[in-house]
Design a protein with these regions (language model features):
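Conserved glycine-rich Rossmann-like NAD(P)H-binding loop of the short-chain dehydrogenase/reductase
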Residues: 29-46
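C-terminal substrate-recognition "lid" of short-chain dehydrogenase/reductases
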Residues: 120-123, 213-242, 247
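Active-site helix of classical SDR
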Residues: 123, 159, 167
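Alpha-helical segment proximal to the catalytic Tyr-Lys
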Residues: 128, 172-176, 233
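The beta1-alpha1 cofactor-binding region of Rossmann-like NAD(H)/NADP(H)-dependent oxidoreductases
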Residues: 41, 62-74, 105, 218-219
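Residue(s) in the substrate-gating loop at a strand-loop-helix junction
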Residues: 143
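Substrate-binding pocket helix/loop in short-chain dehydrogenase/reductase
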Residues: 99-100, 107-112, 194, 205
Length: 248
């Protein structure tokens, strides 16, 4: 039997990148997948079709995850159309890097809104559904910089540290209701963003990783499957650093 057979997963920011990889892996493991992105354009429709090709139900929803009302409306629609929400993955995220003295208020507010407030919005909307089910798994996508910080990314690091603390707090509050909450903290992952770096910077990063390679989106997706499935039924309030040993 597939690890996520019959479950419904809601993934934010999943039309591309890590979110898309998670959606496809979940579908491969039998989960029905609802996902959001700011717009569901041709790329989003293609992602929807790729997910559905695994023989599961799939639908993309256009939504600004940082908007409280829109998030509530999406969750209501997903519950009506899919019947349940068993797994929530808060993956929506952006970067607007800059050194502290050069960072604008807009850069700070935008990153906190998309990366952290969005997670609050969707958790707030999904928890009542999961409470009625007496089960649920919430996965916050954090980052190693949320654990250790990073110069030039004060806004991003703060948002990801917040994702970790949010997961731990929800785990404590919702554990008695059968709801688990954990965070994944990826390290240097090969995505479109990191591939845009010049080779010297990439080599420098990889030289600091004991496994001597960047991670793949599949590495993150496999970790999400573990946290979303019954394999991790006694795991909550934890942060899994998927970073090749970069931070120990």
């Amino acid at each position: 039997m597939k690890l996520l057979e019959g479950k419904t997963a809601l993934i934010t920011g999943a039309a591309r990148g890590i979110g898309k990889a998670i959606a496809l892996k979940f579908a491969e493991e039998g989960a029905n997948v609802a996902f959001t992105d700011l717009v569901i354009d041709e790329n989003g429709k293609a992602t929807e079709a790729e997910i559905a090709a695994y023989g599961v139900k799939a639908k993309g929803y256009a939504s600004n995850a940082a908007d409280f009302i829109q998030s509530e409306e999406v969750v209501k629609l997903v519950k009506e159309e899919f019947g349940s929400i068993d797994i929530l993955i808060n993956n929506a995220g952006i970067t607007k890097d800059g050194l502290m003295l050069r960072m604008t208020e807009q850069q700070w507010d935008a990153v906190i809104a998309v990366n952290l407030k969005s997670a609050f919005n969707f958790i707030h909307a999904c928890v009542p559904v999961m409470m009625r089910q007496r089960s649920g798994s919430i996965i916050n996508m954090a980052s190693v910089v949320g654990v250790h910080g990073n110069a030039g990314q004060a806004n991003y690091a703060a948002s990801k540290a917040g994702m970790i603390a949010l997961a731990k707090s929800v785990a404590q509050e919702m554990g008695p209701k059968g709801i688990r909450a954990n965070a994944i903290a990826p390290g240097f992952i090969d995505t479109a963003m990191t591939q845009a770096l010049n080779n010297d910077i990439r080599k420098e990063w990889i030289s600091k990783i004991p496994l001597r390679r960047g991670g793949t989106v599949e590495d993150i997706a496999n970790t999400a499957v573990y946290l979303g499935s019954e394999l991790s039924s006694y795991v909550t309030g934890q942060v899994l650093q998927v970073d090749g040993g970069m931070n120990m």
